[in-house]
């Protein structure tokens, strides 16, 4: 993976991390109900960023899925850590929180990557293959 691809993946990860995280972090902890508490706009950004990565970078299908999927549980885990500093007993079941949002992030990432692959195929853009 070249440095430009790595940079694009990092930018897309943090863009998705903050668009999911900031609205989610503002919800009071006692009213959070996952996965409904995740902002729809943030999840759309995850899929859109995955689609753009597929169209514009040399990152592979699975690299994009792994990075973009991780952005959603990372935002939830950041809240777990922050709330854990304030009240150590607040997130006793944090592994379940991660397990609940992981499929949501995966679904958004896969949808975006598949859409990007479909658009690339329809426009005649060559698919980039990983060099061996």
Region spans (language model):
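Transmembrane alpha-helical segments of multi-pass membrane transport proteins and ion-pumping complexes
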Residues: 17-21, 46-54, 76, 109-117
């Amino acid at each position: 993976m070249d440095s430009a691809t790595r940079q694009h993946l990092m930018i897309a990860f943090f863009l998705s991390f903050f668009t999911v995280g900031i609205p989610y972090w503002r919800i009071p902890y006692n009213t959070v109900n996952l996965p409904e508490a995740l902002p729809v706009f943030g999840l759309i950004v995850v899929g859109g960023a995955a689609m753009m990565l597929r169209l514009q970078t040399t990152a592979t299908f699975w690299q994009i899925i792994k990075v973009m999927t991780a952005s959603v549980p990372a935002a939830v885990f950041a809240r777990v850590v922050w709330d854990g500093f304030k009240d150590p007993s607040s997130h006793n079941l944090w592994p379940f929180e991660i397990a609940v949002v992981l499929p949501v992030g995966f679904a958004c990432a896969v949808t975006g990557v598949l859409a990007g692959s479909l658009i690339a195929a329809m426009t005649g853009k060559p698919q980039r293959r990983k060099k061996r």
